[in-house]
Amino acid sequence: MIPFVAGMLSTASEITNVILAGGTQMAAVLALAKSTGYNENKVALGTTSYIINDKDANLLDTVKSISDIPVLSVNPRLKDSKFEGLRAYSTGFVKEGVGAGGSLIASILKTGIDSKKLLELIDKEYSRVSTSQ
């Protein structure tokens, strides 16, 4: 996955803006893409506040040591979820790394919704998926 995304980053950043999403794995993508080249002015990394606040991840320092791109984060407010499984993310029990933060940031930028409304939609979808057969 890392070589593939690094290659995509090299090409895509020449023609459009790119938000890398995938938590700490994207630091590895940046490191590899640095050798192939990419347009730093069109790249940002998007993640959740859980990854930013994870002292074991050390994402901000890692990214800074590789590239001078912006790192954006979103607090999905999962601690306020109706569902214990989602609340586990906010305590650090569950780790993501699937692009959740970048996806949430893109959704907020595209629709203009806030994190409270986003949580309502997340809870609604979680309920739908967890109760469907």
Q: What are these language model-derived features?
A:
Residues M1-Q133:
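N-terminal loops that bind phosphate or other acidic moieties
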